[in-house]
Amino acid sequence: MKRDKHCFDVTEEGLEMDGAFVAPFYPVLREKRLIHTQSPQKVRKEYHIYVKLADGSELGTHTFTSINNIRYSEYWDECCDAELTSTARKGLQIFLQHIVMQQEYVVCYEVERLGLCMVEPVIFIYGYRKAIVPDGINILFSSQVPIVSDEGKQGNIQELLYYAKRLITLRPGITDILFYVRILGVLRPLLEETGCPADFFVGLFGASGTQKSTYAKLFFAEDSAQFLSFSSYNGKQILKRVEQYSGHIVVVDDYHPLAKKYDREKQQSALDAIARNADSGQGALVVITGEFMEGCFSLQDRMIQISVPKSTTDGYVLSKELQQLQCQKDMLGSLVYEFAQKVYGNFDKMKEQTQKLFLQQENNIYTFRIERNIKFLVVAIRLFEICFPEISAWGIEKQLETSLKSVLENQKKHMDIVRRLEYDKDWTREVFLMLSSPGFKRKYEFSKTASDMNEIIVEGDRIYITEMVLEREMGRFLECRVKSSDISEHLSKTQVLEEDQSLARTKKKNGIRYYVISRSRLKLYYLSTVSRDK
């Protein structure tokens, strides 16, 4: 081997240069890499080198970012280059440079997270063993990439689609929407590149026992690291997980601010962080669960709110079906990966198709963001139909249309209430509407037992209601969290609340403290607001 004036040879004793002995070992280049990093976008070089001894035995491979002045004894104990002369060390350096020049670089792309890591070339990472990359592209995983359960259940596409149909038709109005929220999670990186970022998050709300967490685990939490809770994680920890799981969904379970000030503020702060981060349209799509919707108008407007009422069907049958679907949920992961392959394997075509679908939507001026956000679910449905035209035979178009309309109308109604409460705060009017609503339960006499504190009692012109019941019933009526202190303050200002000389807002009767509301004054106040609005 010749390069310039040097000639190298490997003998039984080791490496020779120009006929002179250099060392009883010599380096061998296994591979040299040119690595494109994702963040920051830079290029670095790596050299994978091992050592051969004179007897032909090989020592382990080590990675170097530079081949200059390698101290072999630091990496391979069998090498004694410290005892070599400067001429011999120089000979090893020249030999290494020579063999490096003889080999071509292997171009690699290093990824640091899941989701769409690079657009040119298109690299979409679903999990460690499931990556969508063009042929001939080499990828490396950095230590930052989270490990996800991406084995999935291998089966033909018809089996996977049948499982999806079972999910969608399980509980129309809930499970069909949740399925397409999962699809939307995969599409989020594409939407960002399309210029239509999905800048919102999803809220799953319902009373205790409505199986919100069960639905969330079934549809969204492919890996345990994707299922967080408001009580155990703060906003910073949640956002870090959101950044890691791009192209997936992160669930934050059980929004339920506790009585303790610290817990309450921690959960509220985490919810606020999720809402602010949603504006970027980057990272994982966040799904939260909770018993009620809370927060200012701006925060709630950034949500797609899905209500989960108690099932009218046999609870045992529904739970059994959910359990069966949960045991097979790896089929959903496999189907979603098949969908991701079709989308990110034909990136330019799907990007163009997505833009067309958004242009086909009506661009009306909207009052609430849900009127715009619901269009993202429509696009998700259409793209899924394009990728899997077989589902047109299911005959669920009307069901999906009804479900989307229900989500839209329910949230518009709720947001109208939130806006009215935030900006008008006419609690006295709301109390009248609550007490006058159809089916509202009340008693017309005291039982003089402890059960009275859980009831609304009407006695003549007076309405007796405890602080706890006022908060509970108004919260149910408005479908949001309220404070009795805000309501009682407004009732006092409008002179609807009966007060004595002590100015205490509650009065004791039969050992229980009640707010005492005058029915006649309450009705007069409401009628005055109606005439004022006209």
Regions of interest found by a model, annotated:
Residues G283-E291, I304-S307:
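Structural recognition of the conserved hydrophobic beta-strand(s) that form the central parallel beta-sheet
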Residues M1-G173, K240-H248, R264, L299-D301, ...:
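Conserved glycine-centered beta->alpha loop in an early N-terminal alpha/beta scaffold
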Residues Q267-S280:
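Conserved catalytic/switch belt of AAA+ P-loop NTPases
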Residues G203-F205, T214-R264:
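AAA+/P-loop NTPase substrate/partner-engagement loops
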Residues M118-Q158, Y163-L167, M350-K534:
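DNA transaction DNA-binding modules
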